[in-house]
């Protein structure tokens, strides 16, 4: 392997293919270092074709009964080479059932001439016939005796996560299985923590891969941010959601280098740190994958971006890697002064002195522990009974009750426990062994105690009943398996194989029963999925290292598709106490300052490579049929009626309505005022609510200077100008935005309009003093928008020689800019008749006839309609959305109901509120007491977290006297098990607790989120269970028309009766009044 020239280093960054000999194939870590020395890592992806004599499994004829617990249906939306993928969880099925489904006429691979033809059909039909993917299945198809390139036992430095931190993350440091069909897809992403990954295609149709070199990964991220601004604003690392698909045509168009390759059955694919990759399956197949790491990865892991919007994403503490393998940089790294510069061209080193020292210390202690374990095991006669019990045929498991793992529990004596019991999620191995239906699960079968291994293995050991729970989220909920799930395999799972040099002498195995009708006659069949045959001696299974995650053998979870709660399910595994001699050895061998084995607890977590999602309920061009009566109930404000001071409001708005005489001077006042308030651009104000401008001006006593000529960052993503209507190009080849993302602000010499040059489409050489907008250049002093009822603001000419607000052209989905760079002319011919007929809830009573084209709330099938400028003046939230949904619009009703605790009104003592009583019904009650409790959120070193930590639990700081620690500070805390742990402080939250009294005198303590004031709109679930009476004499005091109104099918919105109503908002009135009273004060551009 060392004869090749290393100087080339793959400068073209193309995907390389390697064919190792059997001798080269034996050492996984050495071969990975070799292929990097050849430059394979520069492509981000490499193919390895193993030797012909190597086989991971003798036959795959016996896996049809394996359960796929949570298949996902992949729904894809989008167009023009840009797509978003949503995963919807489906019911469990067996591999046999999935095979028949994949080969059915509906889901089978289409006829094609070659790969190019199949690839065209994939991208052309991506949004049709959503396929089903059997993804994220914990387990392995490798036979027990396979030592080379065993995905479940790669022996890389990633094993430190388990050995030193006691953390097993399913799919990251354990294998995952994937059963695919035609068109099942993995979207663009890098691995969690930018790790390596390995993928082996066991059998079936090929799998196509696309890869982008790591040195060009930032370019893909910038392109994705432009296409999907909504997602990028919500999470900087949104590509880790694995929902974004970008076609090769788009990549070519924007000059992003990529390569493609096809993986055949029996081949390995390896992805490298920060290598973006995506791909799809050609038909029914089965693959197995996991993550691993090398010394080169450590620097990548230290700077890897983290998803900030989902707490269940995979996080690995880099502390152990830096402390042990980079000790000279550890102190600087802890202080944030270790500046890491990644070199994507540098290959990895095979080993280092620090790694060799750590491996040697672990191997020495492991040998002593293994010898002690075997001797202790042989002295226990009750093992025979356990062995006999394991030999019994497996019955179909039924539901079992589960203890909340977050609470400490009483342990039974050591002799009452059985070996090899492990948990994964909410399932135990005893479920796979056939617990009878309705039988209670014994406490001693809920947890297994493990010791971390030394070197590259972990050893299963006996429990002593003294384990305590690991700090984790206290509100972790467990799911109960469904009794109607498919049957399981007929043999219990075993543990992973250990190193051959440490195995006890092999015992002869008796033939086990056939696993299925396809098993060979006359002899024992191949061992399926690491299952120990019933006749195998129990000693062999007991010295296997870590508990296999038994998802292949347990009932599937059939709970809701809420991915957040499912991800958080994990099992607690308690430690074993060592004897004096072994404990001394463990302490002595802990030269690197790692956690003592006797105190380490193993925690199993669930990772989801394909997170669940919810697709949009309608297309961007759809128009929901308007329900006038419903809108009138929700919005009584007409723009001039139903207000406390009609004359004041009429004077504020009269000059700008189109049914009044045009006033160019009034428009100048609007534009001039807008130029002095954030965001200083009459077009960017679309995504900047009025309330923000009002608050800014109230907080500032000094009038801000003019911003004309300054460079600021536009709020309107370039995609918003291009994705409307029939545009097929998502982004223009160039725009007037600088390399730093800023654009100059320019002001019209006549109408005082101020805009970004890029937003209005002005070439840089024309952005200077004396510039005039299109409307003033045409001397169209009375120009008005053809899509709304308000004058003023930034206008552009249409193809029909009319005028249109630029913000109206952006927000109305059918409108498109013919010249995207210059933002004109604008084509409105594609607007459907249904949209022209929609009535604006804000101005329909003011205007004598329906005019303009309305937009609608984006929330599901909400039919609330309004003109763009009316909605903006009313404070309706509008935000950038992902392609092809240009703008996300949330009406005031759904904004209030979806904001959660952020918009909750203050509840005072003595106030009448509505809450749920113990009988499940909702009643009126009175608040008689209130208190507040402060909780801290912290992240532990092993990646777990807690968001309900009491301040007094922190021991390294007197939080009750000094307050919370600074964000990001390392603290020491005492957990519920009495032990001290280190964690990083994240944030502080205060929860309000209320004491309420019902009409019958009963009292209840409830949280603020469970209380509804009389002014709030009641959710449907509350209205359906709202009771007018508790059967007490005090009923009349709480009855009335307002209570009866709450029982109507649709309740009048809070917006019609409180100051949240746009027309009655004091902030809204004062802001609008400021527009006309004096020039130079902040105002609202239209």
UniProtKB/Swiss-Prot annotation:
Annotated positions binding Fe cation: 189, 191, 277
EC number(s) stated in the UniProt entry for this protein: 1.14.11.66
UniProt keyword list: Acetylation, Chromatin regulator, Dioxygenase, Iron, Metal-binding, Nucleus, Oxidoreductase, Repeat, Transcription, Transcription regulation, Zinc, Zinc-finger
Ligand binding (Zn(2+)): 235, 241, 307, 309
Cofactor details (free text): Binds 1 Fe(2+) ion per subunit.
Polar residues bias spans: 585-597, 1026-1037
Residues at which 2-oxoglutarate binds: 133, 199, 207, 242
Reaction catalyzed: N(6),N(6),N(6)-trimethyl-L-lysyl(9)-[histone H3] + 2 2-oxoglutarate + 2 O2 = N(6)-methyl-L-lysyl(9)-[histone H3] + 2 formaldehyde + 2 succinate + 2 CO2
Zn finger limits (C2HC pre-PHD-type): 782-815
GO molecular function list: histone demethylase activity; histone H3K36 demethylase activity; histone H3K9 demethylase activity; histone H3K9me2/H3K9me3 demethylase activity; zinc ion binding
Zinc finger (PHD-type): 719-777, 838-895
Source organism, top-level taxon: Eukaryota
Major localization listed first in the record, in broad terms: nucleus
GO cellular component: cytosol; nucleoplasm; pericentric heterochromatin
Sequence positions bearing N6-acetyllysine: 599
Domain JmjC: residue ranges: 146-309
Chain positions covered by the region annotation Disordered: 379-536, 575-624, 1024-1043
Family assignment from sequence similarity: Belongs to the JHDM3 histone demethylase family.
PANTHER family linked to this entry: LYSINE-SPECIFIC DEMETHYLASE (PTHR10694), LYSINE-SPECIFIC DEMETHYLASE 4B (PTHR10694:SF30)
Domain-level remarks: The 2 Tudor domains recognize and bind methylated histones. Double Tudor domain has an interdigitated structure and the unusual fold is required for its ability to bind methylated histone tails.
Protein's UniProt name: Lysine-specific demethylase 4B
Organism listed in the record: Mus musculus (Mouse)
Originating gene: Kdm4b
């Amino acid at each position: 392997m060392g004869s090749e020239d290393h100087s080339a280093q793959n400068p073209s960054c193309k995907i390389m293919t390697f064919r190792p000999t059997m001798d080269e194939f034996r050492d996984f870590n050495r071969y990975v270092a070799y292929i990097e020395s050849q430059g394979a890592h520069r492509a981000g992806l490499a193919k390895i074709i193993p030797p012909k004599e190597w086989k991971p499994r003798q036959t795959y004829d016996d896996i049809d009964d394996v359960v796929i617990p949570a298949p996902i249906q992949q729904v894809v939306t989008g167009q023009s080479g840009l797509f978003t993928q949503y995963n919807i969880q489906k019911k469990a099925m067996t591999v046999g059932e999935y095979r028949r489904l994949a080969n059915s006429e509906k889901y089978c691979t289409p006829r094609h001439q070659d790969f190019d033809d199949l690839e065209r059909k994939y991208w052309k039909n991506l949004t049709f016939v959503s396929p089903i993917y059997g993804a994220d299945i914990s387990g392995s198809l490798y036979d027990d005796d396979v030592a080379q390139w065993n995905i479940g036992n790669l022996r890389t430095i990633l094993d430190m996560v388990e050995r030193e931190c006691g953390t097993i993350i399913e799919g990251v440091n354990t294998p995952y299985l994937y059963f695919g069909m035609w068109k099942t897809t993995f979207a663009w992403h890098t691995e969690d923590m930018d790790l390596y990954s390995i993928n082996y295609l066991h059998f079936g149709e090929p799998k196509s891969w696309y890869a982008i070199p790591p040195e060009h990964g930032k370019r893909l991220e910038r392109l994705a941010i432009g296409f999907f601004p909504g997602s990028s604003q919500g999470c900087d690392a949104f590509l880790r959601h694995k929902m974004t698909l970008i076609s090769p045509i788009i990549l070519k168009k924007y000059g992003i280098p990529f390569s493609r390759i096809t993986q055949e059955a029996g081949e390995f694919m390896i992805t490298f740190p920060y290598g973006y990759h995506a791909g799809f399956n050609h038909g029914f197949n089965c693959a197995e994958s996991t993550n691993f790491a090398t010394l080169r990865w450590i620097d990548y892991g230290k700077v890897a971006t983290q998803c900030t919007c989902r707490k269940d994403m995979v996080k690995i503490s880099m502390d152990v890697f830096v402390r042990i393998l980079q000790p000279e940089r550890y102190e600087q790294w802890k202080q944030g002064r270790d500046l890491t510069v990644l070199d994507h061209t540098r290959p990895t080193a095979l080993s280092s002195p620090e790694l060799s020292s750590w491996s040697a210390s672990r191997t020495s202690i492991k040998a002593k522990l293994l010898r002690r374990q075997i001797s202790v095991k042989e002295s226990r006669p009750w093992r025979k009974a356990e062995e006999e019990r394991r030999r019994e045929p497996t019955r179909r498991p039924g539901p079992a009750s589960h203890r909340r793992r977050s609470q400490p529990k009483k342990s039974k004596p050591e002799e009452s426990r059985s070996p090899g019991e492990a948990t994964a999620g909410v399932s135990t191995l005893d479920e796979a062994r056939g617990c009878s239906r309705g039988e209670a699960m014994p406490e001693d079968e809920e947890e297994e105690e493990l010791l971390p291994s030394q070197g590259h293995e972990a050893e299963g050991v006996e429990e002593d009943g003294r384990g305590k729970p690991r700090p984790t989220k206290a509100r972790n909920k467990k799911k109960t398996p469904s009794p109607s799930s498919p049957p399981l395999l007929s043999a219990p799972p075993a543990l992973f194989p250990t190193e051959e040099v440490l195995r006890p002498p092999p015992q002869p195995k008796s033939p086990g029963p056939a696993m299925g009708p396809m098993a060979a006659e006359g002899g024992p069949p191949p061992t399926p999925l690491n299952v120990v045959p019933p006749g195998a001696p129990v000693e062999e299974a007991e010295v296997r290292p870590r508990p296999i995650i038994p998802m292949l053998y347990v009932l599937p979870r059939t709970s809701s598709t809420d991915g957040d709660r499912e991800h958080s399910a994990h099992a607690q595994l308690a430690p074993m106490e060592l004897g004096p001699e072994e404990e001394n050895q463990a302490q002595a061998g802990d030269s690197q300052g790692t956690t003592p084995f006797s105190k380490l607890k193993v925690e199993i977590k669930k990772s989801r490579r394909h997170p669940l999602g919810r697709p949009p309920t309608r297309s961007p061009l759809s128009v929901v049929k308007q329900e006038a009566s419903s809108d009138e109930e929700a919005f009584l404000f007409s723009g001039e009626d139903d207000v406390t001071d009609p004359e004041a409001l009429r004077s504020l708005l009269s000059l700008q309505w189109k049914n009044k005489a045009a006033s160019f001077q009034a428009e100048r006042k609007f534009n001039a005022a807008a130029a002095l308030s954030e965001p200083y651009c009459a077009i960017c104000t679309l995504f900047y609510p009025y309330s923000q401008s009002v608050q800014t001006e109230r907080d500032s006593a000094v009038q801000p200077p003019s911003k004309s000529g300054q460079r600021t960052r536009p709020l309107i993503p370039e995609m918003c100008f291009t994705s409307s209507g029939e545009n097929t190009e998502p982004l223009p080849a160039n725009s007037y935005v600088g390399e730093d993302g800023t654009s100059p602000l320019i002001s019209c010499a006549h109408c005082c309009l101020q805009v970004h040059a890029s937003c209005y489409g002005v070439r840089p050489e024309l952005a200077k003093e004396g510039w005039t907008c299109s409307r003033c250049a045409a001397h169209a002093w009375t120009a008005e928008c053809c899509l709304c009822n308000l004058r003023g603001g930034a206008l552009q000419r249409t193809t029909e020689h009319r005028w249109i607000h630029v913000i109206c052209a952006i927000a109305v989905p059918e409108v498109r800019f013919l010249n995207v760079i210059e933002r004109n002319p604008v084509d409105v011919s594609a607007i459907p008749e249904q949209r022209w007929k929609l009535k604006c809830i804000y101005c329909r009573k003011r205007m004598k006839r329906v005019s303009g084209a309305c937009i609608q709330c984006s929330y599901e099938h909400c039919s609330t309609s309004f003109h763009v400028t009316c909605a903006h003046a009313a404070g309706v939230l509008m935000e950038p959305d992902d392609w092809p949904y240009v703008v996300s619009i949330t009406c005031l009703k759904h904004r209030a109901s979806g904001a959660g605790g952020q918009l909750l009104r203050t509840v005072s003592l003595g106030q009448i509120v509505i809450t749920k009583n113990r009988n499940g019904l909702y009643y009126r009650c009175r608040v008689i007491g209130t208190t507040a409790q402060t909780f801290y959120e912290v992240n532990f070193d092993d990646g777990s977290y807690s968001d309900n930590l009491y301040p007094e639990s922190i021991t390294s700081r007197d939080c009750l006297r000094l307050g919370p620690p600074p964000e990001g500070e390392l603290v020491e805390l005492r957990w519920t098990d009495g032990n001290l742990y280190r964690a990083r402080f994240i944030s502080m939250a205060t929860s309000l607790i209320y004491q309420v009294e019902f009409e019958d005198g009963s009292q209840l303590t409830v949280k603020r989120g469970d209380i509804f004031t009389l002014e709030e709109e009641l959710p449907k679930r509350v209205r359906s269970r709202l009771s007018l009476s508790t059967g007490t004499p005090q009923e009349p005091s709480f009855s009335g028309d307002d209570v009866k109104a709450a029982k109507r099918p649709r309740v009048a919105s809070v917006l019609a009766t409180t100051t949240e109503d746009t027309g009655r908002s004091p902030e809204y009135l004062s802001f609008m009044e400021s527009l006309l009273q004096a020039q130079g004060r902040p105002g609202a551009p239209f």
